[in-house]
Amino acid sequence: VQPIYRSRPGADAMAPASAEHAEEVATGIWCSPGLTNSYLLTTSDGRVVVNTGMGFEGPVHRAVFDAVDSSPVRYILITQGHYDHVGGLDTLRDADTKVVAQANWEYWRDDNERLLPYRASRSAFAFSGRLADGIAHIQQRFGKKLPAQSSAAADIVVEDRLSLTVGERRIELIATPGGETTDSMVIWLPDERVCLCSNTFGPIFGHIPNLVTIRGDRYRDALTVIDTIERVRALAPEVLLTGHFDPIRGADLIDAELTRLRDAVQYLHDETVAGMNAGKDVRTLMREIALPEELEVGQGYGKLAWDVRAIWENYSGWFHHSSTTELYPVGPEAVSADLVELAGADALTDRARAHLNDGRPLEAIHLAELVTATDDHSGARRVLKEAHEHLLADSVNFWETAWLTKQIERYT
Protein backbone atom coordinates (compact mmCIF):
# COMPACT_ATOMS: atom_id res chain seq x y z
CA VAL A 1 0.00 0.00 0.00
CA GLN A 2 1.38 3.40 -0.98
CA PRO A 3 1.91 5.85 1.92
CA ILE A 4 -1.01 8.26 2.13
CA TYR A 5 1.15 11.37 1.87
CA ARG A 6 1.76 10.60 -1.80
CA SER A 7 -1.91 11.12 -2.65
CA ARG A 8 -2.56 14.22 -0.53
CA PRO A 9 -1.66 17.88 -1.17
CA GLY A 10 1.61 19.19 0.21
CA ALA A 11 2.43 22.22 2.32
CA ASP A 12 2.43 24.51 -0.71
CA ALA A 13 -1.34 24.06 -0.87
CA MET A 14 -1.88 25.47 2.64
CA ALA A 15 -3.62 28.81 2.29
CA PRO A 16 -5.56 31.37 4.36
CA ALA A 17 -9.33 31.02 4.67
CA SER A 18 -11.27 31.93 1.54
CA ALA A 19 -14.25 29.57 1.30
CA GLU A 20 -17.65 30.97 0.34
CA HIS A 21 -19.40 28.03 2.02
CA ALA A 22 -18.54 25.52 4.73
CA GLU A 23 -18.32 21.89 3.64
CA GLU A 24 -20.10 19.13 5.55
CA VAL A 25 -17.37 16.52 6.10
CA ALA A 26 -19.42 14.22 8.36
CA THR A 27 -22.98 14.32 9.65
CA GLY A 28 -23.35 17.66 11.44
CA ILE A 29 -19.63 18.47 11.13
CA TRP A 30 -18.65 21.33 8.86
CA CYS A 31 -15.22 22.52 7.73
CA SER A 32 -14.01 26.01 6.86
CA PRO A 33 -10.49 25.55 5.42
CA GLY A 34 -7.70 27.97 6.31
CA LEU A 35 -4.16 28.20 7.61
CA THR A 36 -5.58 25.62 9.99
CA ASN A 37 -9.04 24.24 9.30
CA SER A 38 -11.83 25.44 11.58
CA TYR A 39 -14.65 22.99 12.26
CA LEU A 40 -18.27 23.46 13.31
CA LEU A 41 -20.20 20.79 15.22
CA THR A 42 -23.95 21.34 15.14
CA THR A 43 -26.21 20.08 17.94
CA SER A 44 -29.79 20.52 19.13
CA ASP A 45 -28.50 22.79 21.90
CA GLY A 46 -26.17 25.19 20.09
CA ARG A 47 -22.90 25.05 18.23
CA VAL A 48 -19.38 23.87 19.03
CA VAL A 49 -16.42 25.34 17.13
CA VAL A 50 -13.03 23.62 16.93
CA ASN A 51 -10.17 26.08 16.29
CA THR A 52 -10.62 29.62 15.03
CA GLY A 53 -7.84 30.38 12.55
CA MET A 54 -5.78 33.55 12.49
CA GLY A 55 -7.39 36.81 13.57
CA PHE A 56 -7.87 38.02 10.02
CA GLU A 57 -9.49 34.68 9.07
CA GLY A 58 -12.13 34.93 11.78
CA PRO A 59 -14.72 36.76 9.63
CA VAL A 60 -14.55 34.03 6.97
CA HIS A 61 -15.08 31.21 9.45
CA ARG A 62 -17.86 33.08 11.24
CA ALA A 63 -19.72 33.91 8.04
CA VAL A 64 -19.70 30.41 6.57
CA PHE A 65 -20.62 28.80 9.89
CA ASP A 66 -23.46 31.27 10.53
CA ALA A 67 -24.85 30.34 7.12
CA VAL A 68 -25.07 26.72 8.31
CA ASP A 69 -26.47 27.34 11.79
CA SER A 70 -26.94 30.62 13.62
CA SER A 71 -27.61 29.16 17.07
CA PRO A 72 -25.37 30.24 19.98
CA VAL A 73 -21.78 29.04 20.09
CA ARG A 74 -21.73 27.02 23.29
CA TYR A 75 -18.08 26.00 23.24
CA ILE A 76 -14.90 26.75 21.35
CA LEU A 77 -12.39 23.91 21.60
CA ILE A 78 -8.73 24.74 20.96
CA THR A 79 -6.57 21.79 19.94
CA GLN A 80 -3.30 23.71 20.37
CA GLY A 81 -2.11 27.22 21.08
CA HIS A 82 -0.49 28.10 17.76
CA TYR A 83 -1.56 31.46 16.36
CA ASP A 84 -3.53 29.87 13.52
CA HIS A 85 -5.74 28.07 16.05
CA VAL A 86 -6.53 30.84 18.55
CA GLY A 87 -6.39 34.05 16.50
CA GLY A 88 -10.09 34.19 15.62
CA LEU A 89 -11.41 33.57 19.14
CA ASP A 90 -12.95 37.01 19.56
CA THR A 91 -14.78 36.76 16.24
CA LEU A 92 -16.12 33.23 16.72
CA ARG A 93 -17.25 33.35 20.33
CA ASP A 94 -20.54 34.71 21.66
CA ALA A 95 -21.09 36.39 25.02
CA ASP A 96 -21.71 33.10 26.84
CA THR A 97 -19.27 30.90 24.91
CA LYS A 98 -16.92 28.76 26.99
CA VAL A 99 -13.41 28.32 25.61
CA VAL A 100 -11.80 24.96 26.37
CA ALA A 101 -8.06 24.29 26.09
CA GLN A 102 -5.51 21.86 27.46
CA ALA A 103 -4.15 22.77 30.88
CA ASN A 104 -0.72 23.82 29.55
CA TRP A 105 -2.22 26.62 27.45
CA GLU A 106 -0.79 29.40 29.64
CA TYR A 107 2.71 27.90 29.53
CA TRP A 108 2.53 27.82 25.75
CA ARG A 109 0.99 31.29 25.46
CA ASP A 110 3.62 32.80 27.75
CA ASP A 111 6.42 31.33 25.61
CA ASN A 112 4.89 32.92 22.53
CA GLU A 113 4.37 36.30 24.15
CA ARG A 114 7.84 36.63 25.66
CA LEU A 115 9.46 35.64 22.35
CA LEU A 116 7.00 37.35 20.00
CA PRO A 117 9.49 39.62 18.14
CA TYR A 118 12.05 36.83 17.87
CA ARG A 119 9.64 34.19 16.59
CA ALA A 120 7.83 36.58 14.26
CA SER A 121 11.08 37.62 12.61
CA ARG A 122 12.18 34.01 12.22
CA SER A 123 8.88 32.90 10.69
CA ALA A 124 8.59 35.74 8.19
CA PHE A 125 10.78 34.09 5.54
CA ALA A 126 8.24 31.28 5.23
CA PHE A 127 4.88 32.96 5.74
CA SER A 128 4.96 36.71 5.07
CA GLY A 129 3.96 36.53 1.40
CA ARG A 130 1.25 33.95 2.01
CA LEU A 131 -0.23 35.99 4.87
CA ALA A 132 -0.20 39.22 2.88
CA ASP A 133 -2.03 37.60 -0.03
CA GLY A 134 -4.61 36.06 2.29
CA ILE A 135 -5.27 39.31 4.12
CA ALA A 136 -5.73 41.19 0.84
CA HIS A 137 -8.25 38.61 -0.40
CA ILE A 138 -10.28 38.71 2.83
CA GLN A 139 -10.24 42.52 2.82
CA GLN A 140 -11.90 42.49 -0.60
CA ARG A 141 -14.75 40.53 0.96
CA PHE A 142 -15.06 42.04 4.44
CA GLY A 143 -13.46 45.48 4.15
CA LYS A 144 -10.04 46.88 5.03
CA LYS A 145 -10.42 46.72 8.80
CA LEU A 146 -10.07 43.10 9.85
CA PRO A 147 -10.02 41.81 13.44
CA ALA A 148 -6.73 41.81 15.30
CA GLN A 149 -5.18 38.58 16.49
CA SER A 150 -6.99 37.33 19.61
CA SER A 151 -5.03 36.33 22.68
CA ALA A 152 -5.24 32.74 23.87
CA ALA A 153 -7.69 32.23 26.71
CA ALA A 154 -9.54 29.37 28.40
CA ASP A 155 -12.57 29.12 30.66
CA ILE A 156 -12.26 25.35 31.08
CA VAL A 157 -9.02 23.35 31.05
CA VAL A 158 -8.36 19.71 30.24
CA GLU A 159 -5.69 17.99 32.32
CA ASP A 160 -5.88 14.56 30.69
CA ARG A 161 -9.45 13.84 29.58
CA LEU A 162 -12.72 15.74 29.80
CA SER A 163 -16.19 14.76 28.60
CA LEU A 164 -18.81 17.21 27.38
CA THR A 165 -22.38 16.64 26.24
CA VAL A 166 -23.97 19.30 24.06
CA GLY A 167 -27.48 18.43 22.96
CA GLU A 168 -27.31 14.87 21.64
CA ARG A 169 -23.58 15.03 20.90
CA ARG A 170 -20.99 13.39 23.18
CA ILE A 171 -17.54 14.95 23.00
CA GLU A 172 -14.34 13.74 24.64
CA LEU A 173 -11.27 15.96 24.90
CA ILE A 174 -8.00 14.06 25.21
CA ALA A 175 -4.60 15.61 25.98
CA THR A 176 -1.87 14.74 23.48
CA PRO A 177 1.36 16.26 24.84
CA GLY A 178 3.39 14.86 21.95
CA GLY A 179 1.63 17.08 19.44
CA GLU A 180 3.08 20.26 17.96
CA THR A 181 2.65 22.12 21.25
CA THR A 182 2.71 21.32 24.95
CA ASP A 183 -1.01 22.20 25.13
CA SER A 184 -2.08 19.85 22.34
CA MET A 185 -5.30 17.85 22.55
CA VAL A 186 -7.63 15.99 20.20
CA ILE A 187 -11.42 15.98 20.02
CA TRP A 188 -13.00 12.53 20.02
CA LEU A 189 -16.62 11.91 19.05
CA PRO A 190 -17.18 8.33 20.28
CA ASP A 191 -20.63 7.85 18.79
CA GLU A 192 -19.48 8.85 15.30
CA ARG A 193 -15.94 7.48 15.76
CA VAL A 194 -14.58 10.75 14.43
CA CYS A 195 -11.32 12.22 15.75
CA LEU A 196 -10.57 15.89 15.15
CA CYS A 197 -6.80 15.78 15.52
CA SER A 198 -6.02 19.02 13.66
CA ASN A 199 -2.21 19.44 13.58
CA THR A 200 -1.39 16.93 16.32
CA PHE A 201 0.73 14.98 13.82
CA GLY A 202 1.88 18.07 11.96
CA PRO A 203 0.00 20.25 9.48
CA ILE A 204 0.23 17.76 6.61
CA PHE A 205 -0.70 14.23 7.61
CA GLY A 206 1.57 11.34 6.74
CA HIS A 207 4.80 13.33 7.00
CA ILE A 208 7.46 12.95 9.67
CA PRO A 209 6.70 15.30 12.57
CA ASN A 210 8.93 18.28 13.21
CA LEU A 211 10.81 17.53 16.43
CA VAL A 212 12.13 21.08 16.25
CA THR A 213 11.29 23.93 13.91
CA ILE A 214 13.88 26.02 12.08
CA ARG A 215 11.83 29.13 12.91
CA GLY A 216 12.70 28.48 16.56
CA ASP A 217 10.87 26.48 19.22
CA ARG A 218 11.49 24.14 22.11
CA TYR A 219 12.51 20.60 21.23
CA ARG A 220 9.70 18.04 20.99
CA ASP A 221 10.49 14.73 22.63
CA ALA A 222 10.36 11.76 20.26
CA LEU A 223 9.09 9.28 22.85
CA THR A 224 6.27 11.64 23.84
CA VAL A 225 5.36 11.96 20.17
CA ILE A 226 5.20 8.17 19.92
CA ASP A 227 2.94 7.96 22.97
CA THR A 228 0.61 10.56 21.46
CA ILE A 229 0.37 8.73 18.13
CA GLU A 230 -0.45 5.54 19.99
CA ARG A 231 -3.04 7.28 22.14
CA VAL A 232 -4.96 8.40 19.08
CA ARG A 233 -4.48 5.09 17.26
CA ALA A 234 -5.97 3.23 20.24
CA LEU A 235 -9.24 5.12 19.74
CA ALA A 236 -9.67 3.26 16.41
CA PRO A 237 -11.21 6.26 14.63
CA GLU A 238 -13.10 5.74 11.39
CA VAL A 239 -12.64 9.36 10.32
CA LEU A 240 -9.66 11.63 11.01
CA LEU A 241 -10.20 15.38 10.58
CA THR A 242 -6.81 17.03 10.29
CA GLY A 243 -5.66 20.63 10.19
CA HIS A 244 -5.51 20.70 6.39
CA PHE A 245 -7.23 19.17 3.41
CA ASP A 246 -9.81 16.40 3.14
CA PRO A 247 -10.81 13.96 5.88
CA ILE A 248 -9.03 10.62 6.10
CA ARG A 249 -11.62 7.87 6.08
CA GLY A 250 -11.47 4.19 6.96
CA ALA A 251 -10.44 2.59 10.25
CA ASP A 252 -7.94 0.25 8.62
CA LEU A 253 -6.26 3.02 6.61
CA ILE A 254 -6.02 5.31 9.64
CA ASP A 255 -4.62 2.51 11.80
CA ALA A 256 -2.03 1.63 9.16
CA GLU A 257 -0.92 5.23 8.71
CA LEU A 258 -0.66 5.95 12.43
CA THR A 259 1.26 2.70 12.91
CA ARG A 260 3.63 3.67 10.10
CA LEU A 261 4.16 7.13 11.62
CA ARG A 262 4.69 5.75 15.12
CA ASP A 263 7.20 3.17 13.92
CA ALA A 264 9.05 5.73 11.78
CA VAL A 265 9.59 8.04 14.76
CA GLN A 266 10.59 5.06 16.92
CA TYR A 267 13.11 3.94 14.29
CA LEU A 268 14.68 7.41 14.06
CA HIS A 269 14.87 7.59 17.84
CA ASP A 270 16.41 4.16 18.29
CA GLU A 271 18.95 4.55 15.48
CA THR A 272 20.02 7.96 16.79
CA VAL A 273 20.47 6.63 20.32
CA ALA A 274 22.40 3.64 19.00
CA GLY A 275 24.66 5.96 17.03
CA MET A 276 25.25 8.17 20.05
CA ASN A 277 26.20 5.16 22.15
CA ALA A 278 28.53 3.98 19.37
CA GLY A 279 30.39 7.30 19.48
CA LYS A 280 29.21 8.69 16.15
CA ASP A 281 28.90 12.44 15.74
CA VAL A 282 25.57 14.06 14.95
CA ARG A 283 26.34 15.05 11.36
CA THR A 284 27.40 11.50 10.54
CA LEU A 285 24.08 10.25 11.87
CA MET A 286 22.18 12.95 9.96
CA ARG A 287 23.79 11.60 6.78
CA GLU A 288 23.50 7.90 7.56
CA ILE A 289 20.09 7.34 9.14
CA ALA A 290 17.32 6.58 6.67
CA LEU A 291 13.99 4.83 7.09
CA PRO A 292 13.43 1.35 5.68
CA GLU A 293 11.05 1.23 2.72
CA GLU A 294 8.13 -0.11 4.76
CA LEU A 295 8.28 2.94 7.05
CA GLU A 296 8.31 5.55 4.28
CA VAL A 297 6.73 8.83 5.34
CA GLY A 298 6.80 12.25 3.73
CA GLN A 299 9.35 14.94 4.48
CA GLY A 300 7.29 17.89 3.33
CA TYR A 301 7.22 19.62 6.71
CA GLY A 302 9.65 17.80 8.99
CA LYS A 303 12.87 16.16 7.78
CA LEU A 304 14.51 12.95 8.90
CA ALA A 305 17.96 14.51 9.26
CA TRP A 306 16.60 17.44 11.27
CA ASP A 307 14.77 15.04 13.59
CA VAL A 308 17.95 13.03 14.10
CA ARG A 309 19.68 16.20 15.23
CA ALA A 310 16.72 17.18 17.42
CA ILE A 311 16.74 13.79 19.14
CA TRP A 312 20.50 14.05 19.67
CA GLU A 313 20.39 17.55 21.11
CA ASN A 314 17.25 16.93 23.16
CA TYR A 315 19.19 14.18 24.94
CA SER A 316 22.65 15.72 24.88
CA GLY A 317 22.39 19.50 24.60
CA TRP A 318 24.49 21.90 22.56
CA PHE A 319 28.03 20.73 23.47
CA HIS A 320 29.06 18.17 20.87
CA HIS A 321 32.59 17.53 22.25
CA SER A 322 34.13 18.37 18.88
CA SER A 323 36.01 21.57 19.80
CA THR A 324 36.98 23.48 22.92
CA THR A 325 35.65 26.60 21.20
CA GLU A 326 32.08 25.29 21.56
CA LEU A 327 32.37 26.24 25.24
CA TYR A 328 33.21 29.88 24.58
CA PRO A 329 31.54 32.88 22.89
CA VAL A 330 33.95 32.99 19.94
CA GLY A 331 32.70 31.19 16.84
CA PRO A 332 34.49 30.19 13.62
CA GLU A 333 33.39 33.45 12.00
CA ALA A 334 35.83 35.28 14.29
CA VAL A 335 38.72 34.12 12.10
CA SER A 336 37.03 34.42 8.70
CA ALA A 337 39.01 37.55 7.87
CA ASP A 338 42.27 35.77 8.75
CA LEU A 339 41.48 32.89 6.42
CA VAL A 340 40.52 35.24 3.59
CA GLU A 341 43.71 37.25 4.09
CA LEU A 342 45.87 34.12 4.09
CA ALA A 343 44.20 32.27 1.21
CA GLY A 344 42.84 35.18 -0.79
CA ALA A 345 39.22 35.93 -1.61
CA ASP A 346 39.61 34.94 -5.26
CA ALA A 347 41.30 31.65 -4.44
CA LEU A 348 38.62 30.72 -1.92
CA THR A 349 35.91 31.65 -4.40
CA ASP A 350 37.56 29.57 -7.11
CA ARG A 351 37.72 26.56 -4.80
CA ALA A 352 34.08 27.12 -3.80
CA ARG A 353 33.18 27.16 -7.50
CA ALA A 354 35.08 23.90 -8.01
CA HIS A 355 33.13 22.25 -5.19
CA LEU A 356 29.88 23.47 -6.72
CA ASN A 357 30.82 22.23 -10.17
CA ASP A 358 31.57 18.81 -8.67
CA GLY A 359 28.14 18.62 -6.99
CA ARG A 360 29.16 19.69 -3.48
CA PRO A 361 27.02 22.79 -2.83
CA LEU A 362 27.40 22.71 0.94
CA GLU A 363 31.18 22.76 0.77
CA ALA A 364 30.86 25.62 -1.72
CA ILE A 365 28.67 27.56 0.71
CA HIS A 366 31.14 27.07 3.56
CA LEU A 367 33.98 28.60 1.56
CA ALA A 368 31.99 31.35 -0.15
CA GLU A 369 30.53 32.49 3.17
CA LEU A 370 34.06 32.98 4.51
CA VAL A 371 34.59 35.47 1.72
CA THR A 372 31.28 37.33 1.99
CA ALA A 373 31.69 37.63 5.77
CA THR A 374 34.46 40.15 5.14
CA ASP A 375 34.01 41.27 1.53
CA ASP A 376 31.02 41.88 -0.74
CA HIS A 377 32.68 39.72 -3.37
CA SER A 378 30.52 39.40 -6.49
CA GLY A 379 32.00 36.04 -7.46
CA ALA A 380 31.39 34.57 -4.02
CA ARG A 381 27.83 35.90 -4.08
CA ARG A 382 27.23 34.19 -7.43
CA VAL A 383 28.53 30.92 -6.01
CA LEU A 384 26.23 31.27 -3.02
CA LYS A 385 23.23 31.98 -5.22
CA GLU A 386 23.92 29.01 -7.47
CA ALA A 387 24.69 26.68 -4.55
CA HIS A 388 21.33 27.51 -2.98
CA GLU A 389 19.63 26.96 -6.35
CA HIS A 390 21.30 23.55 -6.51
CA LEU A 391 19.91 22.65 -3.09
CA LEU A 392 16.48 24.05 -3.96
CA ALA A 393 16.21 21.79 -7.00
CA ASP A 394 16.20 18.76 -4.70
CA SER A 395 14.05 20.18 -1.89
CA VAL A 396 10.55 18.86 -1.16
CA ASN A 397 10.34 20.39 2.31
CA PHE A 398 8.25 23.50 3.00
CA TRP A 399 10.67 25.09 5.47
CA GLU A 400 13.81 24.18 3.56
CA THR A 401 12.35 25.48 0.30
CA ALA A 402 11.28 28.75 1.91
CA TRP A 403 14.72 29.27 3.45
CA LEU A 404 16.61 28.46 0.27
CA THR A 405 14.35 30.72 -1.78
CA LYS A 406 14.98 33.60 0.61
CA GLN A 407 18.73 33.05 0.45
CA ILE A 408 18.65 33.06 -3.36
CA GLU A 409 16.89 36.43 -3.20
CA ARG A 410 19.54 37.65 -0.77
CA TYR A 411 22.42 36.78 -3.08
CA THR A 412 20.77 37.89 -6.33
What are these model-predicted stretches?
Residues 22, 45, 56-101, 157:
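Active-site metal-binding motif and surrounding structural segment of the metallo-beta-lactamase
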Residues 88-91, 104, 109-116, 121, ...:
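Short acidic, glycine/serine/threonine-rich loops at helix termini
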Residues 30, 77, 98-100, 156-158, ...:
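Hydrophobic/aromatic beta-strand patches that form the interior of the parallel beta-sheet core
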Residues 1-12, 117-118, 131-133, 139, ...:
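Accessory terminal helices/loops
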Residues 19-68, 186-189, 193-199:
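Conserved beta-strand hairpin/beta-sheet module of binuclear metal-dependent hydrolase folds
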Residues 28, 41, 51, 65, ...:
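Divalent metal-coordination and catalytic microenvironments
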Residues 47, 54-56, 107-175, 224-236, ...:
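Metallo-beta-lactamase
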